A protein has these predicted regions:
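Glycine- and Gly-Pro-enriched alpha-helical subdomains that act as flexible
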Residues: 1-41
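Short glycine/serine/threonine-biased micro-segments
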Residues: 3-5, 109-116
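Hydrophobic residues within well-ordered alpha-helices
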Residues: 29-32, 70, 123
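Functionally constrained cores in energy, signaling, and assembly domains
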Residues: 32, 36-39, 93-97, 126
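Short, conserved loop-to-beta-strand elements that form functional interface hotspots
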Residues: 43-113
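Divalent-metal-activated hydrolytic enzyme cores
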Residues: 46, 132-133
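C-terminal edge-of-domain segments
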Residues: 115-132
Length: 134
């Protein structure tokens, strides 16, 4: 949302709205993807850093699964929002797993994260103009 100047999660999914209680986070991600596409912007690069004690994210299979799930959200929204482009280009040629980097670190047992009481995620999103892709 920040990469497209669309405020924050609370602007779109207020915690005062009961329907947002226990909302699947993929709904938030897909909403942000749709808003970006409406502004003619698509993913250039996504860099994710997870800060947690467990589970250990160093396992490549876990990272591959996370990337696959993220890419599937892009494909699903792109199919809905861009049928004209889909007719010309396979979105799997537009969104590839090398556009997403996932890494993890611990807080070396410090603070609430180090005690296993929470997780932090930092993301940097780079977008590009959709019109340059097809």
């Amino acid at each position: 949302l920040g990469a497209i100047g669309a405020g924050d999660i609370g602007d779109h999914f207020p915690d005062t709205d009961p329907k947002n209680k226990n909302l699947d986070s993929s709904a938030i991600v897909m909403h942000a993807i749709r808003l970006a596409i409406e502004k003619k912007l698509i993913l250039n690069n996504l860099d994710i850093t997870l800060l947690l004690e467990s589970p250990k994210i160093s396992d490549q299979e876990y990272k591959i699964t996370m990337k696959r799930n993220i890419l599937e959200m892009f494909f699903e929204v792109f199919h809905i929002c861009c049928p004209d482009i889909i007719s010309k280009t396979n979105p799997r040629n537009i969104f590839t797993d090398d556009m997403i980097n996932i890494k993890a670190s611990t807080s070396e047992s410090l603070g609430f994260i180090g005690k296993g009481q929470g997780v932090t995620c930092y993301c940097i999103v780079s977008l590009k103009n959709l019109n340059n892709e097809h």
